[in-house]
């Protein structure tokens, strides 16, 4: 039986349904993604951290409580772990693996997480977010070189490129040639 988890229906809410579902003869709960996603995500496929259970859903303690309750009622759990989904948020520093790949390129410890053709674009990572041509965006002053602010988590103190709401890392070595 599939349960769609979100801030309004958490792991503890799912836990409260277990006796009823077991009474219906359900053998397994199929849980929508439980990994840490963008705040307020209604579906969980916009993952920010593949190593933690979403605190909006109750975190790891709530998942453990659900597992214990399911075990007592002979229900199995199937979790949609979505390793192939990751959020592209405007504040890329909220997604540490993506931030590192954008900043460090193929030298990032997370470069192998992404399907990147490093031979395309002269070995650089392309991110299609511009609303117009590069020349038009430069002429409009839409691209701003800056330093990450203290309230910007992983961007704090680092060189960044701002494009409207987007905050993008720059290589510490400076711009590449070519």
What is each model feature region?
Residues 1-178:
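Acidic/aromatic-lined carbohydrate-recognition and catalytic surfaces
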